């Protein structure tokens, strides 16, 4: 039987157990031995990180060939146009590659959203918008690069789900342990 931890990673935490100067790591939150992250999430992003004690499960979660969708709540600067949203849905050019098509929708600000520390910068004359963006790949800083490529920089990024696993009812810094078959 495999075990899986659903961890709601706070802003500023790095996705490794070894501490680095100036960063809080997973070891500050999870003390169970034998668990390793299945994928990563940047220190300046928040939300779901899955950790497991099973190498095969870790591969199935993190390997793009299994096409496990990752769903993000993204606060962007400005109000995206229909053209920008269609580009996200078709795939956009980021550096030297074209991203796979994404599912992208405008959304209301998530309910029960915790405050980010430090807070997102506020600009009185520039509105912000929330998007729900689902992708099946996970290249480094991909969501941030995708929104920037269509003209709307990411201000806050929260991974809400990986496949059917979500951070619903898990406070930042909190985690749930599941037994899987």
Annotate each PLM feature:
Residues 1-181:
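RNA pseudouridine synthases
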